[in-house]
Design a protein with these regions (language model features):
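Short metal-coordination and nucleic-acid-contact micro-motifs, chiefly zinc-binding Cys/His arrays
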Residues: 77-80, 101
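Short Cys/His-rich "knuckle" micro-motifs
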Residues: 70, 94-99
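Glycine-centered loop/turn positions within well-structured domains
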Residues: 82, 94, 103
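Cysteine-rich micro-motifs
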Residues: 99-110
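Short, cysteine/histidine-rich loop/knuckle motifs that typically chelate Zn2+
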Residues: 85-87, 107
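Interaction interfaces in information-processing and related assembly proteins
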Residues: 1-78
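Short functional micro-motifs and their immediate structural scaffolds
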Residues: 91-92, 110
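Solvent-exposed, flexible loop/coil residues
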Residues: 54, 85, 100
């Protein structure tokens, strides 16, 4: 599998994850709308608020990953993919296999 194919697969998986998390977030928001507005005295209120924050954080993380994957796809088009953005050395194939959207080598990432 080429780097572009691997990135395209990762992009599709990330888009699917964003869609699932968006649906889950919408469900949590709907549940919070039908719960007691007084979170302090509603035993489920705090749980719903926590779940809403957790899903929102996961959604934000997935959106950032999509931006990283799109940037990596752009680097494949320019021929810069697999080269560290900081030091210019090649990024180890093992790192790219684990994190295809990586823009830095292990040394620079530390």
């Amino acid at each position: 599998m080429t780097a572009a194919q691997d990135l395209a697969r990762t992009r599709a998986e990330t888009i699917a994850q964003i869609a699932a998390l968006t649906a889950e977030f919408d469900e949590v928001v709907a549940a919070s709308a039908s719960s007691n507005a007084d979170d302090e005295h509603d035993p489920e209120g705090a749980t719903i608020a926590f779940e809403r924050q957790q899903v929102a954080a996961l959604l934000d993380q997935a959106r950032r990953r999509l931006e990283d994957v799109d940037a990596a796809l752009a680097r494949t088009a320019t021929g810069d993919y697999g080269r560290c953005a900081d030091c210019g050395r090649p990024i180890a194939p093992e790192r790219l296999a684990a994190r295809p959207q990586a823009r830095t080598c292990i040394d620079c990432a530390r």
